[in-house]
């Protein structure tokens, strides 16, 4: 839990929920904090013990502790962009999220869209800008129209995102997004119902969870809406059975084509009655306010079962 990004506190919440809900008759869990400057375990009485980064071990009261599996709840870097996955793969330590390549790919919105287009996945119109490039508002408007969304290309939880309604807002929005990443993506506005689809590997099967409809009190599903109660999250979504099956099948298709494992949560907007893919989150939030645990509950899966299945799947991989 933890990480190096703006999502640090969200990750801590997720990690604590997992820690609390693991079956103690099967697992002996430790709370591992991975921060920019230090890696440590929180022991009894909240005592920190430093992690040996050369082999991911810790010594507590003279006893060397090694780990059979890592439950990865880090959002953003390094847990969601492939860095932690690559490190653990080198050490031959199983972990619960997707592998290095899938993690790096899905964290990069530009690359992910490029990979998915050959499979017929509909997306918003998009325009990409690298830091240092000239930003041409007229060219952007000609490509994606107004209103549009300016986003950091590699960031989660809607950090660094602005809904732009006029030409004069484009430059400030790009500067804001560049605070999160050196690449930005500008997307056309899609008017329609926003939904979130969790897809997981559960008991050795790929399972699409009940669909959640997202109704934000803000103009879009930003950080406040996601984590500070500024949205309604309605599970199951108020869409037809046909729409539900269609968006679940697309989410499962993406999961299979990318050779995913672990948890994923894909966001779509039904525009002109067609689901348009927005993004995939491969380390979705697992706090009490998060969508995927709500979906699991709606499917009759307890948190203990959900988290236990993730560990068992990782150990068998």
Which functions belong to the PLM regions below?
Residues 1-101, 105-107, 111, 130-139:
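ATP-binding N-terminal substructure of ATP-dependent carboxylate-amine bond-forming enzymes
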Residues 29, 94-95, 123, 148, ...:
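Hydrophobic beta-strand scaffold residues
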Residues 44-50, 86, 221-228, 282:
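Short, flexible, mixed-charge acidic loops at enzyme active sites
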Residues 165-249, 270-276:
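Phosphate-binding site of ATP-dependent enzymes
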Residues 188, 197-199, 255-288, 296:
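Conserved metal-phosphate-binding beta-hairpin within the catalytic cores
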Residues 213-264, 291-317:
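Active-site "cap" helix and flanking loop/linker of ATP-utilizing ligase/carboxylase catalytic domains
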